Amino acid sequence: MWPFGKSTADRVKDAFKANPVLAPLGLEVQESRGTVKVTGEVARQSQIGLINAVAGGINGVKNIDVSGVTVLQQASAPAAQTAPTTPAQTSPSVQDSPSTPVQMPDIVQQGAGDVEIEDTSRIAKAVLSAIRGNGELANNPIDVLQSGNSVILRGAVDSDHELRLAEQLARGVQGVSGVDISGLRVAQGAKELAKDKDEDTGDTVYTVKPGDSLSKIAEHYYGDQMEYKKIAHYNNISNPDLIQPGQKLRIPG
């Protein structure tokens, strides 16, 4: 369960799938030490900017590498249309006009809505920046996704007060028309739980402490003790009662 059981790469993938332009592209995502590497193909150059904007709204993303993304169709100027030919009318009193060509401005051909979607997706990054700049919320695991001019907050906070604060900050960002906090939950100790990350993979890793049990750990991360089976299976633990202090467990999504 996000935010504790999903790697940074998986959360970036989820954000891409939630975007109507990027969802059909099937982009691949890898992450190491905060750098997200995206590979795949896009139709237009403008979608590279959209990738950066969407990934930039994900908590834990420090850098975005799009060198592995290929643009299939480069932006180009459309061919000039030829004016229909009409019979020339001669008049001895009118001089011929000069044949100097008129310099026309360059026209960049883009799909309808590409620029608007890219620009509005940048709102999510601005909201995340506002949350990161707040002393109470800076270390909370919160992702910001974009839906039109509205933002969707996903993750966890320590209290109802922080939940209201996150919504208030998001609404205060210029361009935000609505805030969805249905994916933002209150989880005691959210800040501490979010620190349990593998720096190389972004996976959640928990170090077993004296007195811990798998059911207690499952309650901590999932809010359900019976989810201990998921943790046991993911870590190849045959006997759930035999875990040792200092043992590191990966927490599956």
Swiss-Prot record:
Keyword set, alphabetical order: Repeat
Region (Disordered): 79-105
Keyword Repeat belongs to the record: yes
Superkingdom per UniProt: Bacteria
Composition-biased stretches (Low complexity): 79-93
Keyword Lyase listed: no
Signal sequence coordinates: none
InterPro entries the record matches: BON_dom (IPR007055), Lipoprotein_DolP (IPR051686), LysM_dom (IPR018392), LysM_dom_sf (IPR036779), Transpt-assoc_nodulatn_dom_bac (IPR014004)
SUPFAM superfamilies the record matches: LysM domain
Domain LysM: 204-251
Positions of the BON domain: 4-73, 119-188
Protein name (Swiss-Prot/TrEMBL): Uncharacterized protein DR_0888
Organism listed in the record: Deinococcus radiodurans (strain ATCC 13939 / DSM 20539 / JCM 16871 / CCUG 27074 / LMG 4051 / NBRC 15346 / NCIMB 9279 / VKM B-1422 / R1)
